[in-house]
Each structure stands twice: as C-alpha cells, then as structure tokens.
Design a protein with these regions (language model features):
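Terminal, compositionally biased segments used for targeting/anchoring and flexible tails
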Residues: 1-88
Length: 88
C-alpha cells in the first residue's frame, strides 16, 4: 500500500507545483521553508500517511502548511487534431 501512496504523493506534488506556477499569488500564503502537506477529501488513509511523512521529514521550528484539495481531475492530452499515418 505504501508504494501506491508514494505514487499518489508524487502526482499530487507535481500537480501542486504546476498549480503554483500557474497561480503564483498562491505562494504568498506559504511561509518560506514551510513543509507542505497535501490532504485529499475522502482519502483518510492517504492523508494520515502524508501527515506522518511530513512530520518525519520536518525540520524543527519550520511551519507546516496543509493544502486541502477536493479531487484530482483526469489528465487530458493537449494534442490538437492528431493523425496517424501508417507507412508500408
């Protein structure tokens, strides 16, 4: 089970970083050096795992910021009008 949590965590962190890149004003709410903990609605097992990971890796005196998300939307392709041509 831990491996799937690790995979989900990597995906959520990547998506959160992309979100911050697209919405830089959001970074103003995150103190410098803070440990960011992503919490997903309706996934208490992952949330507990994520909090434990953050506490284990947190440097003393550093703040913790919880980022609550409702869900992760399906990834979409950004290809426009792809066409497949078979060469024989």
């Amino acid at each position: 089970m831990a491996e799937s949590f690790e995979q989900r965590h990597a995906t959520l962190i990547r998506e959160f970083n992309e979100f911050l890149f697209e919405h830089p004003e959001f970074t103003e709410e995150i103190p410098q050096g803070a440990t960011v903990v992503i919490q997903v609605a309706d996934d208490q097992e992952y949330n507990a795992w994520s909090r434990a990971l953050a506490e284990a890796n947190r440097e003393p005196g550093r703040p913790i910021v919880y980022v609550h998300v409702d869900a992760l939307a399906p990834r979409r392709s950004r290809l426009v009008n792809p066409q497949i041509r078979l060469l024989r």
